[in-house]
Amino acid sequence: MKLIGITGMPGSGKSAITKLAEKYKIVVVSMGDVVRYETLKQGMPLNPENVGNTAVKLREIYGKEAIAVPCLNYVNEKYNNEDFVIIEGIRSIYEVNYIKKHAELDIIAIHSSPKTRFERLSGRNREDDSNDWNTFVERDERELNFSIGRVISLADYMVVNEGNYMDFVNDLENTFKKIINVN
């Protein structure tokens, strides 16, 4: 099984991979869903502060590989017979290193400017998103403290998402097809 890791700052366009995965019948496991699930398990409502604090606590408890460990266990238990599995939302170089110790992994980084990402996040109405610039910046700082910048800069592939959505999806699909060896 080969894993395809998707990384990028919040609002960069990582979730676009889900539509491509459906097209190619490839499973997607979201690391963010793991954190949101843990937040709800603790009885806390989903908002930027609670989800962010849960991510920090998970890393304090389990170390810097915290989200990768349960995520990879889940992938191995549920999808061991798949040729490819996408792990969406890798944020830490430690997570990358952990996964690479246990599986073949290629990383696709999706990049968008802070202004573009803030506009997207303000409009998508998810519980852990914010319409406030300062909260947005705090979230970015938290993500950068997880070493997501290193993951992005060391990614195997980079796709920029600043303009037309269909151009972005086409670029992402072309990158995706290189990894899964489809013409």
From Swiss-Prot:
GO molecular function, one term: ATP binding
Annotated Pfam families: AAA_17
Source species: Methanococcus maripaludis (strain DSM 14266 / JCM 13030 / NBRC 101832 / S2 / LL)
The protein, known as: UPF0200 protein MMP1282
InterPro entries: NTP_hydrolase-rel, P-loop_NTPase
Family: Belongs to the UPF0200 family.
The keyword ATP-binding belongs to this UniProt entry's keyword annotation: yes
Binding site for ATP: 8-15
Presence of the UniProt keyword Signal in the record: no
Top-level division of the source organism's lineage: Archaea
Alphabetically ordered keywords of this record: ATP-binding, Nucleotide-binding
Lineage of origin: Archaea, Methanobacteriati, Methanobacteriota, Methanomada group, Methanococci
